[in-house]
Amino acid sequence: MFGAVRISLHVQCIWSFKRTLDKSDHLYWSAYSGWYSTTDEAFYSDWEVDTSPLGAVSKTSGNQVHWVEEETFRFRLSAFKPKLHVWLDSGVLPNESPEHAGLLALTHKTLDRLEDPCVSRPSSRVPWGIPVPGRIDQTIYVWFDALMNYLTAGGVSFTADGNSQALWPPDIHFVGKDILCFHAILWPAILMALDLPLPKKIIPHGHILVGGTKMSKSLGNVLSPADVLGDLSRALSVSPVHGEVDAESVASDCLRYCLVRSVCLNEDTTFSLPFAKETVNTELVNWLGNLLSRITSKKIAPNQTAPMLDLAEAQQFLSAPADAKFFNDLSQLPFVFDDFWWDRLLPNRSVDAVMHVVRQTNAFVDRHKPWAAGGDGDAQAVVGVALEALRLVGCCLSPLTPYLSNRLLNCLGLHPGKLRGHSWRLDLTHQPLIPRLNV
């Protein structure tokens, strides 16, 4: 969510939120002292500061800090600590992986240590901020200002027109793990003070590393998405056999796919262009693309048609022991995918399940060799099951790779308005799903 902090609506909402907190005695005027980082625009407590050859630095960012004493408005965070501890343990934060469990424990510990934070700064040092109503010597502290963007952009206000909550609260709030303190402590405390609903779930994600280091403008190791998309587009080895290919759409699908495969929702992960190319060539070109090409070939499906069998019907023809697990995994794929994607919020695990079925389908085809069966019932059943697997794969991957998924379904004679029928009628163009990326 992006918002310009100087727009009139946001300024008016900030003032109204501040007045509401004043009336409920959640703000007070007080002296404040602490370690301040100009680079981070944040105060740090003693336990958050370390010494270095450069002097005092933030343990979190490594940026220099200096001691500051000033008078400001402060927020009574201490009044909400008991409620916040209960809320944090209510399941709002994930607790399945060791990384997430560690973040939850750290958030509880941080909450215990935090003092009442400042919500304003002297305008002599921060003249560019939104002024505090009635106090020309104070400006709204940037962290309070930034968090309020969620409410103003979501249509929440405390103006004379009333309190509209059209887009509040969010079902899921994705935040970087380094700003979890703001979003899992300060932000819900403010919402409690304003008597507004809290986010239903907060998902802290890891960082995308470059060369093992978090991306930073100061380090000069930032990867621009536009540059990566350009590199991927230029690496596509498109030939006439691929037909009309939208290189930009293919590159976008590949980048999204690789980012989700990087598991960055659970932990830090290193991203590189060679990794992306290897992932695409292995999983989308070799595993998925080659499966589509051979199962729709005229050697295996000479009439370019096949019956749409359900798995119970297919089992009448196919009884190899390995088929039972494959049929079970295939029938459960939509449910497993949805569980990981929507309920457990682990999209990388969703894609794991899809690629597992792709590999199983390749093994299933190799095991039954429909090209050598002479077009009998067994061969037709193999083709029908493999095509059904491809259909489910295309549907599951559509949120992640919409262009390639649509291309795959078109090859099966399907489209968004028709995802199932009585029989398969394949696309006769036989275009490969995706061009290989030049490494």
Name each model feature, range by range.
Residues 94-96, 336-351:
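Short helix-to-loop capping/linker segments positioned immediately adjacent to catalytic or ligand/cofactor-binding
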Residues 12-19, 146-149, 287-297, 360, ...:
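Alpha-helical scaffold segments in carbohydrate-active enzymes
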Residues 268-273, 331-340:
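Short, charged/polar, low-complexity loop and linker segments
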Residues 42-46, 208-215, 281-285, 312-328, ...:
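Short, mixed-charge aromatic SLiMs
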Residues 11, 32, 57-302, 354:
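Structured secondary-structure scaffolds
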